Design a protein with these regions (language model features):
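Double-stranded beta-helix
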Residues: 3-34
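Noncatalytic scaffold domains of N-terminal-nucleophile
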Residues: 68-88, 92, 100-267, 272-274, ...
Length: 613
């Protein structure tokens, strides 16, 4: 089976909806579904579409450049991605009658080509999908898995101490079993309307004809040049013949990726998980010079996508739904919003010192619980419902002092967690990844966060795509002070993630918002900030995205350089915060659904673009 039976849904607060377990009519598996209570249902039609006009598509794709924009409005459909070329592919698919899942396939594969440092078929993804006809929210786990031969000491040196982070990243050691392609295939088979091969063809064509290297991609290559030169295949793709990094505007072709996609277009994921692509992936990982890995053909053949129940919680009159474990996103955001709901935020400015202090303290408190409890719940017994228990969050909110930094913040003891004997984990999760949001003409919605973990992943390249370094999202130490760490590496386990694809519903149960971001562990405060901007202060989605970023995942409060947040430094230090002013490059993409149409926003910190009709 491609999908396995999910665990019990997590749904806290006074959320209005129905939870049922039923047999899916498209496959032999059990599924738990969440249905918001709707006053009106939107029917999803199955439409017959003509073949894409590829020549005109490719011409328009090659001409697009990144331009900062205000919020975009549309009445029928909308797509917001991190790259203008990917947005155009999604737009063209929707324009021709394809649905949100069809557009998702086209967008992800194009991102693999034009934003290779952030995501691709060599990595993993989380998808939150709203099926308008069925009035269902589903979440799909395409997260990478640890090789079956990997052990908890994978990132320990001979003396038992953890290796330096990038010593673990670069090479085959860090590569987990990729899940993104399987996720695309499974969801397209269940929900897609256009032919699979038709969705892949635009990326094949552009890979063969060549695309212009964007400013951000060129900058990323330059900044990581030393590591990218480690392996010949990667070096030959990202550098000119004289050894200099590819500059902005270079016409870059990727015939190897085009050939890979032609196989996938014709045969689906079979060659990737069982055939010649699988063999090349394993060979690349196991023969990585200086740092070989454990990934095997058995790992690829045994990979499956898991359809999990979404984690939903209330904020004001809205219901916020996100991805559950192994993602820590929905739980940690839910904790932050739950604690902040006990303060009179309406009386505060979203950019003022008081709110910024409260937000940072809630951020830190939530991360204390995240570090102790959150991991792959198929391997670690988690107090999932207890972490979002309203009374528990009310109690935790009382630890926040509005006039100074609270002393001695530590993990709490949520209901059902009294017998947990674990050690906290403060693993690094560096910024990378990509996010996109799609709403189609039938009202279906996709919120998908996708990654190869660190920028350029393991730096290993095969058949035109990069392989992930997802295993470094596990704790490098399996235990601390004699106690096991929840997010320790175990064979077949999925590493904890901060990816937070989110869907929001209004008090009538109607879809209101799709949002998410890249950014490593700072994804969580980035998305929380944006949700508060829209849901608390009634901001336009673009205004909420544009708000200065603030994060306090650990002991230091980060303020976004080059924004008004810099002016908070003295005030925050007077309250007792240790402050760092630094770039906080989120990549938020969001769509808000209103009675009069769609409003989209893309993060000006990257190259995002919203398109719609």
């Amino acid at each position: 089976m491609l999908l396995v039976e999910p665990k019990e849904v997590v749904n806290i607060g006074d959320a209005e909806g129905e939870l049922t377990a039923e047999n899916d009519d498209r496959g032999n598996y059990q599924r738990s579904v969440f249905r918001p209570i709707l006053q009106q249902n939107t029917n999803r039609g199955i439409m017959l579409i003509n073949r894409l006009l590829l020549s005109s598509i490719i011409a328009s794709l090659m001409a697009i450049s990144a331009i900062a924009q205000d919020s975009k409005k549309a009445s029928k459909f909308m797509v917001a991605t991190a790259n203008p070329v990917a947005s155009k592919v999604g737009y063209d698919i929707l324009k021709r009658g394809g649905n949100a899942i069809d557009a998702m396939v086209g967008v992800q594969l194009m991102l693999n080509l034009v934003e290779p440092q952030s995501s691709g078929i060599g990595g993993g993804a989380f998808l939150l999908f709203y099926d308008a006809e069925r009035n269902e929210v589903s979440s799909f786990d395409g997260r990478e898995t640890a090789p079956l031969k990997a052990k908890g000491d994978l990132f320990l040196k001979e003396d038992g101490s953890p290796m330096k982070f990038f010593d673990g990243v670069v090479g085959g050691r860090s590569v987990g079993t990729p899940g993104t392609l399987k996720l695309l295939e499974v969801t397209h088979k269940n929900y897609g309307s256009l032919p699979w091969e038709e969705l892949i063809e635009p990326t094949i064509q552009l890979a063969e004809k060549g695309f212009r290297v964007s400013k951000r991609m060129a900058s990323s290559v330059e900044q990581d040049a030393e590591r990218l030169k480690t392996f010949p295949a990667t070096k030959s793709y990202f550098f000119l013949n004289d050894g200099t990094p590819i500059p902005e505007g270079t016409l870059l072709r990727n015939p190897d990726f085009a050939q890979t996609l032609r196989l996938i277009a014709a045969q689906g994921s079979e060659p990737f998980y069982y055939g010649e692509i699988a063999r090349d992936i394993v060979r690349t990982v196991q023969e990585a010079k200086g740092n070989p890995g454990k990934l095997s053909l058995a790992d690829l053949r045994n990979y499956w996508v898991i359809e999990r129940p979404p984690v939903c919680h209330d904020y004001k009159q809205f219901q916020v739904c996100g991805m559950g474990p192994p993602s820590s996103g929905a739980l940690t955001i839910g904790q932050m919003l739950g604690m902040l709901s006990h303060f009179e935020l309406d009386k505060l400015s979203p950019t003022g010192p008081t709110f910024s202090h409260l937000f940072a303290e809630a951020n830190l408190l939530a991360f204390k619980d995240r570090g102790l409890y959150m991991a792959d719940s198929d391997y670690v017994d988690m107090p999932t419902k207890g972490l979002l228990n309203p009374q528990y969050l009310k109690m935790r909110s009382k630890l926040i002092n509005s006039s100074k930094v609270s002393d001695g913040m530590s993990p709490g003891v949520p209901p059902t967690a009294s017998n947990y004997q674990l050690s906290p984990d403060a693993s690094m999760e560096l910024p990378s990844t990509s996010h996109f949001a799609i709403v189609d003409a039938q009202g279906n919605a996709v919120s998908m966060t996708t990654t190869i973990e660190n920028g350029f992943g393991s730096r290993l390249m095969t058949r035109g795509f990069l392989l992930n370094n997802e295993l470094t999202d596990f704790s490098f130490r399996p235990e601390q002070d004699g106690q096991l760490i929840a997010n320790r590496l175990e064979p077949g386990k999925r590493p904890r993630s901060s990816m937070s694809p989110t869907l929001v519903f209004n008090s009538s149960g109607q879809l209101h918002m799709a949002v998410g971001s890249p950014g490593g562990s700072r994804i969580i405060p980035y998305v929380a900030k944006t949700l508060l901007g829209v849901l608390q202060w009634n901001m336009d989605i673009q205004e909420a995205i544009n708000l200065p970023n603030i994060a306090k995942n650990f002991s230091t409060m980060d303020l976004e350089a080059g924004t008004s947040a810099e002016q908070l430094k003295v005030d925050m230090e007077q309250l007792g915060h240790k402050v760092s002013v630094r770039p906080l490059t989120s990549g938020l993409q969001g769509i808000v659904i209103t009675p009069t149409g769609l409003i989209g926003g893309a993060d000006p910190r990257r190259e995002g673009l919203v398109l719609g009709d």
